[in-house]
């Protein structure tokens, strides 16, 4: 995914007894596996896909046990999808979780918050913030990223930080149904023709 040599995501947790070379380290990002899944679907002639995964990343922490933050990753390609399709999915998810007031900032290929930023097209990706806290990154994958995975069409991906999202989520409060159901009434108002509707609405409210 075009990570620079000094990327913190290259600092991995090594497994003592791996099943094979491909599984010898713990993943530090969900994005590579999502790209592999999209590549597999593309090579099997699936015209379009829209996928997601929830899982943990494993980040080294000195001599201690690694951190295991929960993440969510999305991936999609197909003629019906574009940058705004991915943005719409994220907006719907945030709305469902009760996260209001999220802000979107352009990402220029580098990011202090997400090591995966080089994987995205520098002019077609954005970071998601809530109250100044970065909760996600999404956009169109860089042509070199697509070439590395053998994906011959434009593809889009997103990564979201679940702990930060849940911290920003508004807890919903449920109330019992009213004992007496509401009723709807139609009102007929007699007035002069020169009275604006806005004045009537203001008087009613």
Annotate each language-model stretch with its function:
Residues 1-205:
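Extended beta-strand-rich architecture
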């Amino acid at each position: 995914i075009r990570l620079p040599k000094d990327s913190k995501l290259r600092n991995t947790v090594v497994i003592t007894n791996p099943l094979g070379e491909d599984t010898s380290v713990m993943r530090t990002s969900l994005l590579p596996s999502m790209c592999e899944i999209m590549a597999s679907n593309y090579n099997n002639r699936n015209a379009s896909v829209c996928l997601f995964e929830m899982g943990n990343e494993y980040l080294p922490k000195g001599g201690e046990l690694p951190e295991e933050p929960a993440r969510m990753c999305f991936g999609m390609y197909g003629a019906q999808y574009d940058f705004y399709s991915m943005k719409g999915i994220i907006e719907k998810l945030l709305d469902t979780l009760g996260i209001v007031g999220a802000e979107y900032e352009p990402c220029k290929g580098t990011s202090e918050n997400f090591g995966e930023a080089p994987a995205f097209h520098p002019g077609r990706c954005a970071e998601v913030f809530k109250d100044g806290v970065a909760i996600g990154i999404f956009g169109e994958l860089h042509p070199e990223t697509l070439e590395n995975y053998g994906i011959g069409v434009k593809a889009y991906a997103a990564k979201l930080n679940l702990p930060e999202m849940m911290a920003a989520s508004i807890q919903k409060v449920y109330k019992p149904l009213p004992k007496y159901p509401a009723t709807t009434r139609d009102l007929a108002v007699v007035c002069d023709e020169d009275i604006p509707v806005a004045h009537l609405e203001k008087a009613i409210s």
